[in-house]
Amino acid sequence: MAGGALGAGVVGVGVGTIFAGIARDAFQAEPAVDDGPDELLREPARAPERRQVRSADGTRLNVEVYGTDAADSDDVVVMVHGWTCNTAYWYPQINALAERTTVVAYDQRGHGRSERGRARPTVAMLGQDLDAVLDAVVGDGRRAVLVGHSMGGMTIMSWAAQYADKVPTTVSGVALTSTAAKAVLQNHTLIPMNLPRYTRPFEATVGKLFTSAPVPIPKTPYGGRLSHYIALGPNARKAHVDFVDDMIGACPHRSRAGWGAAMGKLDVTAGLEALTVPTTVIVGSDDRLTPTSHAEQMAEVLRRNGHLRDLVIYDGVGHMSSIEAAERFNELLADILAEVGSEKVPA
């Protein structure tokens, strides 16, 4: 009994020291730049066409189509958001692209307006959900450009691993943004490097608690400082920090925990190998959740296979790269569409 209590106490001290170090760095950092609202983050003026798409297990997914109908459009972009986000994550791209492009965004299961489903979340489910969406929105003989952020990039790779034969016939290009193919919880830079050495054995425990503890996130005046530290770059705009903090806070805690636990077993390298179309890898230099090492590893696999379009690193940008660097990101998407677009399936 005494030994167990002592062990628990040691763990508590180690874990507590790490969380205290994260909080210290978050609150000592420069506050976000308050330079007014970002018009790209506004809700799109034109309401989307909303569809309910059922995944393989019957879970209903909320799908939003902006712009012209996918069947009539020259370009179709399917956007897949990340962990704790929802379709609003893509507002900067929808607002910039939807007038001339069909933009499809959907809520991952358990996020936004999509059902959570009854089964325990798995990375394989993410790919199956994406397959159901693609079947519903990409017409026969058409191909789309897939854009995935964070868990959304993992979703694309999960889909490619399970449906490799569909990759060349369904997709003309891919953008993997601020994401990883494996070991995402083992390779991050959230924990300060200057903590006592005795905390090292408890870093994995902190990672699991951070991602998979099923507890609500209380709304406090200080939450934005933590969101800034965790998810955005050091010079982020306050409008971006507030937007991200509100979006994360809106994610149901059970979904956040379930998908956080699922990512603990992440390995979609088979899907990365199956991406046989031009693929762009994008990351911020200051991404703490999926550091540049992940992007470089993915880019090397794609380069070796002859399918790397480009590796793009945005200086000073954190994990929310397509919000923080929206103008540059939108220009990059426009370039990708100009090169590959939603081409017809090769004869």
Segments the model singles out, each with a brief description of its role:
Residues F210-G271:
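Conserved alpha/beta-hydrolase catalytic His-Asp/Glu region
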Residues L275, V281-V283, D287:
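Short beta-strand/loop motif that positions the catalytic acidic residue
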Residues M1-V76, E99-T102, G139, P168, ...:
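Alpha/beta-hydrolase fold catalytic core
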Residues L289, L311-L332:
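Catalytic histidine-centered segment of alpha/beta-hydrolase-like enzymes
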